């Protein structure tokens, strides 16, 4: 199931659509790093600036896969 959530990053509200396992993983990563979900997504958003055509939801999925791969 795909879940759409609104997150505020850089004082701007944006929507992210992810499958449930990705939301669970994203929350686990934020919790383990002791930061908010919005802070983590903001970090991911800053990293994707090198690939501007990459959507934020895709960037989040790639971040999660790379996080667990390492």
Task: Please give the residue ranges for each predicted region.
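C-terminal structural segments of small proteins and small subunits
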Residues: 51-70
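Amphipathic alpha-helical interface segments used for dimerization/assembly
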Residues: 30, 41, 64-68
């Amino acid at each position: 199931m795909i879940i759409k959530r609104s997150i505020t990053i850089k004082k701007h509200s944006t929507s992210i659509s992810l499958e449930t396992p990705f939301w669970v993983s994203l929350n686990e990563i934020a919790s383990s790093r002791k930061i908010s979900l919005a802070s983590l997504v903001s970090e991911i958003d800053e990293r994707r600036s090198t690939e501007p055509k990459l959507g934020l939801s895709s960037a989040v999925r790639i971040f999660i896969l790379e996080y667990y791969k390492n």
